[in-house]
Amino acid sequence: MFRGRFAPSPTGEMHLGNARTALLAWLQARVNNGKFILRLEDLDTARTRQGAADQILRDLEWLGLDWDEGWDIGGEFEPYIQSERPDLYANYATRLETYPCSCSRKDIQNVVSAPHNTEPRYAGTCRTRTTHARATALRFRVPDVEIAFTDGVCGTITENVQNTIGDFVIRRNDGAWAYQLACVVDDLEMQITDVLRGQDLLGSTARQILLYKAFNAKPPRFYHVPLLTDFQGKRLAKRDHALSIKTLRQSGISPSELTRDLAQSLGWKINAACHPKDLLECFKIWIQASSG
């Protein structure tokens, strides 16, 4: 059975870009008569905002989206909150070839959050180090192999992670599990078959496929959809409060009007306000055209 998911982080108000990705992931699940799962990626505790998770649920419900499993309603693979799953990540980590790394916090401070920008390659400083003067992170020993995969939107992608990123962190030196490992473990455990997410995460995919291979598991199908940008072409971020769903709701826009606007932002020929279920055929045409 098709199993898709939307996995937001509770670090602020959901903006238009998040909403469009959620809409597309929901449409993909419903077009395929599958399950739509909500998972909360809250490992970055320093940036987590109180009440953000509940606001995400309210925004999704207001938009007209429903889900079959999630952190609010539970399901077969609960808990659906990453901060409640550390023992699972620790268990999976023992199955990987790893080594401790005591490089400075500056080198590793961003690995808990999903990465959105190009990261510098790690030089392997601690690969052969046997003693450490301070607390250590845990790095996955990346093999020198080329990873090739076909993305449902972006086409064929190839990358040698050892050449581009090097050995990457799976646990930070403060004990927090990193995005790459947690994401893969959760998708495996929740039996996710298809991952539709923003193109800002395309660069994470080869690393995640390496982890799937290390676990002798089959990766899901990936679809990295275009990001919604502002008039300057910049990716929308949660700091753009004027574009948050909460603010738009308070301004008086209706969910059907916003759904129409999101559809139009994808180039879909939708003129009237509509419910998400009215876009199923549009999504079929769009995803087929995107896959070429």
Which residues are covered by each model-predicted region?
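Alpha-helix initiation and N-capping motif
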Residues: 53, 86, 105, 119, ...
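Short, structured secondary-structure boundary patches
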Residues: 55-63, 87-94, 120-126, 241-245, ...
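Active-site cores that bind ATP or allylic diphosphates and position pyrophosphate for catalysis
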Residues: 107-237, 244-249
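A short, terminal or domain-edge coil/loop segment
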Residues: 61, 91-100, 154-162, 272-291
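N-terminal Rossmann-like or analogous alpha/beta NTP/dinucleotide-binding catalytic cores
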Residues: 1-116, 199-200, 204-217
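Structural motif
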Residues: 14-16, 173-176, 252-254
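Catalytic adenosine-cofactor/nucleotide-binding cores of aminoacyl-tRNA synthetases and other
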Residues: 45, 104, 203-204, 214-292
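Short, basic, helix/turn surface patches
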Residues: 60-71, 124-134, 251-254
